[in-house]
Regions:
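Transmembrane helical cores of multi-pass secondary ion antiporters/exchangers
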Residues: 1-334
Length: 334
């Protein structure tokens, strides 16, 4: 079915508008905003109002663009003076915490899939770990949305530690996901190859993000553009240059853009306020588009056969893993 560009724009604008209205309702009840965007997509999807969208390739490409900007903006919002006192435990939680969550949750999924629950759900060990890796990290926007709506006050250095952990754990999850996908596609990869890929992506990602971030700061402060709005467009170009350059060097592009965002955000930058405002707006738009699109890809009737397994995994993940990480951050009150 061919749809004109005018109809496509009308439907897209209407979906985004409805998602924004739904997010207001979710905020009142302490429901994460991004979850409301996802539910909006499911409501308007195939099993809802009948909008059909099943192009996974398009979703992947849009998701890549969105994640680059979201992670870069998160890096810019991370203040080094706040996270310096909690840098060591925060990084430990963002790396080893995600790794252990992936490991134990993956083993649990593999164990549950062998229970013969008559669900037709079965995973290999690598497949189980891949599933766990995709849900091993937390989202900083969602975390603080819940904290604000529930009026939870964080004392001492817990807030910056939570910001650091939530903002920096995504690259680790992406890295694990990419490595596990490579293992599945290769049909078997040696431990040394996995270790080398892990180290290469981390080292090149961090080094590339830092160096290109410093270069971006130097160029922005010296280019001398007459139109102030062009600085925001320039930063947008730098985001994708950094991601693609590091990716082509076999590094982790998502980690690179996050590190570059931290470098740029903590440097003296011309038109910094205007750039931040522009990126905040872009981040919200892309979060809406990405989660709305993911919701459209979901067919709720296909979830029924796997619901029991999914509920068991969710309960295990919260009660034993995420809660233990929250305890490390917030203490016994968690």
């Amino acid at each position: 079915m061919n749809v004109s560009i005018e109809i496509g724009l009308l439907v897209s604008a209407f979906l985004i508008f409805c998602s924004i209205l739904m997010s207001k309702t979710g905020y009142r009840f302490g429901i994460p905003t991004l979850l409301m965007f996802l539910l909006a997509g499911m409501l308007f999807g195939t099993d809802g109002l009948g909008i059909q969208f099943d192009d996974v390739s398009v979703a992947q490409h849009i998701g890549m663009v969105a994640l680059c900007i979201i992670l870069f903006t998160g890096g810019m919002d991370t203040k080094m003076e706040d996270i310096r006192p909690v840098l060591s435990p925060g990084v430990m939680l963002a790396t080893s915490g995600v790794f252990l969550t992936t490991l134990f949750c993956g083993l649990f999924v593999y164990w549950v899939s062998g229970w013969q629950l008559h669900t037709g759900v079965g995973f290999t060990l690598i497949g189980s770990l891949l599933l766990a890796a995709t849900m091993s990290s937390t989202d900083s926007a969602s975390v603080f949305n819940i904290l604000r709506s529930q009026q939870i006050n964080l004392k001492h250095n817990l807030k910056p530690m939570l910001e650091l952990e939530s903002g920096s754990n995504d690259p680790m999850a992406y890295l694990l996901t990419i490595i596990l996908i490579q293992c599945l596609q290769a049909g078997g990869v040696s431990g040394w190859e996995i270790l080398w890929s892990f180290l290469l992506q981390f080292v090149v990602g961090i080094a590339g993000g830092y160096l290109l971030g410093r270069l971006s700061v130097w160029l922005i402060n010296r280019v001398g553009l007459k139109n102030a709005e062009l600085y925001s467009i320039m930063v947008l170009c730098f985001i994708f240059i950094i991601y693609c350059s590091v990716y082509l060097l076999k590094g982790n592009g998502y980690l690179a853009v996050y590190i570059a965002g931290m470098v740029i955000g903590n440097s003296r930058l011309f038109k910094k306020k205007e750039i931040g405002t522009f990126l905040d707006g872009m981040t919200w738009l892309l979060q809406i588009v990405m989660f709305l699109m993911l919701g459209l890809l979901v067919n709720p009737h296909e979830m029924l056969p796997v619901m029991l397994t999914a509920v068991l995994v969710s309960v295990f993940t919260y009660t034993t893993l995420f809660r233990s990480r929250l305890y490390d951050l917030c203490g016994p009150s968690a």
